[in-house]
């Protein structure tokens, strides 16, 4: 599976069969325009990634995950069937705004959906939007767990799949997210092959250094991935 980090919690996944999946894309300057310089992007937008995927995943309703500045552009470009899998609060907001432009599916922990050559499972997240979820994606024999924004919570452990090839999780320790210590602790328990820290680099005010997280796992068998933005890597 091909993976591209779009910044913050946003990713684009492409299966061997060509199915494209985008999760939590924030590809605008909406937050800075609405809330000021604390939300100035450290990573510029690359407009070529403002393309409509086959499947869009939204973990929760916060504006750096359900960004209407990005989503309005994506929905304007819809030229093929689009399915949106969204947490409850985001589901209702998006369905009201975009109506019949997509097939909207309400995802709560435990919900499973198979689309084309990908299987999606919603898992719990402990965040300030109570309807927040994470996603486990399965395709091409690869299991990816994107936790969404979350604190360390025992409910995450109860839902873990038998194998996690790539774990994607926040480390910034702000806004009801795990800090580096708790993120490393969760990583050790889940024992993925790879871990990719997210949600630390886009806004300096709400970010953190990534090296302390990597250092905490330096003696562990897991490989820490810190890919360049908008650059493809393959699992």
Residue spans for each PLM region:
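Pre-active-site segment of Zn-dependent metallo-hydrolases
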Residues: 18-57, 61, 69-77, 150-162
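Active-site HxH/HxHxD metal-binding segment of metal-dependent hydrolases
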Residues: 44-113
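Binuclear metal-ion centers of metallo-dependent hydrolases, dominated by the metallo-beta-lactamase
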Residues: 98-113, 158-160, 184, 188-235
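Active-site environment of divalent metal-dependent phosphoester hydrolases
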Residues: 9, 29-30, 62-66, 91-94, ...
